[in-house]
Amino acid sequence: LRAWIHEEAGGRRWRISARSFFQNRPAGVDALVDVVGAMVADLAPTPGGPMVDAYAGVGIFADTVGVGRTVTAVERGKTSLADARVNLAARIKDGTVRIAPSAVEQWKPTPAEVVVADPARAGLDRDGVRVLMKCQPDLFVLVGCDHSSFARDAALLVRAGLRLERLVVVDLFPGTSHVEPVGAF
């Protein structure tokens, strides 16, 4: 019995286990990859600096936006970690991706030019912001699954010394009121 499926999104095929998180529409993944990718391409100071993919899930941002960069993918979910190891196998083998099996809040941060964080609805909160700011990023891209937690986390990032440079609202669920804000700080 196989406990995973494959989805096409972000220009490639992904393995997703039954208990791993993945957007319910591949078109939604494509939209997020496009928005986050444009922010990184436009606002990161150099094209190949190190990147942290926080709350990495199955590895979407590590292997789309992170191409051409060395990436540390931080994830705590066991099934997501297993999927990420499969999805990122070639990049793990060539040393351009390292997986950190940890909750972001307990992870020992490493310096990174870019941080991409896509937390669950609860958001980053103080501990997530505190840890990720220790990476000393030049660019911090926050994907918000909930507008209230995004607003709280954006305020925490501003208090930590960052400035909101760009905000895009992505309609991942057409016909509903749910949207996902994506901010570049």
Model segments located where?
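Rossmann-like S-adenosyl-L-methionine
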Residues: L1-F185
